[in-house]
Amino acid sequence: MGISHSIVVALRSVLKQCGLKIATKTLEGFVREIDRVAPWYACSGSLTVASWDKLKGDLVREQQKGKLKAGIIPLWKLVKSCLTDEDCQQMVEAGQKVLDEIQESLSEVERGEKVKVERKQSALKNLGLSTGLEPEEKRYKGKNALGEIRKRDEKGEKKGDRAGEAHKERSLYPPLVEFKQLTLSNSEPDEGVSTSEETDSEEEAVRYKGERYQQDKMATQPRKRQKAADESQLAAWPPDCRLQGPSAPPLYVQR
């Protein structure tokens, strides 16, 4: 507990120099998480950009597994910003001295335990990278590993195909709700022609016929008057002056 408390004091001093105030409990949880994820840091870590970036790699891998506590990465970024700030270099150096003293005070037993944990984690990490197997696939590793994995993949593909076909069938047709919206209830008016619209159409047809009749009547009246005037004028002429049609040719006399 004394070692962790000393690291917490060093980090809090560095953050305070940059104007950042972090609660002691938060920093204690941060240090415990670092000690769990990267036990090498307590033995050989330092308050340098290179060592802090190396620590980030272990934190990110733990985060990808879903085992890293919330708030660790943001707090790591705050410390990283202080390490690169020239105004905080004096406090960074002071914190580094504290870290050096902690590392020197570690007993051979504590140092050996941390190194042992680090080697175990490194071996597990390298095993996963070399085999290329996921944690679930490692459980199947053995005599029938390939057969078990193949059966599992085939089952997954069949389930995926059935789910895909079901989704395809559902997507081909719209939901029934849309069809219900298309039906007409008894309370809704029919979209056909209403009675008032039919009456208006009939009246419009009668009016149109009346206008056409008046136009035709007005057009024929002048012709009738002209014809009657011509007939009366012809009747007033003497018979000799009336127009005669062409006379018939004289009869042919045989000599």
From Swiss-Prot:
Residues 148-171, 204-215 have a biased composition (Basic and acidic residues). Keywords: Transposable element. Signal peptide: none annotated. The keyword Amino-acid biosynthesis does not apply. Transmembrane segments: none annotated. One of its GO terms (molecular function) is structural molecule activity. Residues 135-255 are annotated as: Disordered. The keyword Magnesium does not apply. Pfam families: Gag_p10 (PF02337). SUPFAM superfamilies: Retroviral matrix proteins. Intracisternal A-particle Gag-related polyprotein: Intracisternal A particles (IAPs) are defective retroviral elements. Due to extensive mutations in the envelope coding sequence, IAPs can only form defective viral particles confined to the intracisternae of the Golgi. IAPs are an important class of transposable elements that induce genomic mutations and cell transformation by disrupting gene expression. This is Intracisternal A-particle Gag-related polyprotein. It comes from Mouse intracisternal a-particle MIAE (IAP-MIAE). The lineage of its organism: Viruses, Riboviria, Pararnavirae, Artverviricota, Revtraviricetes.
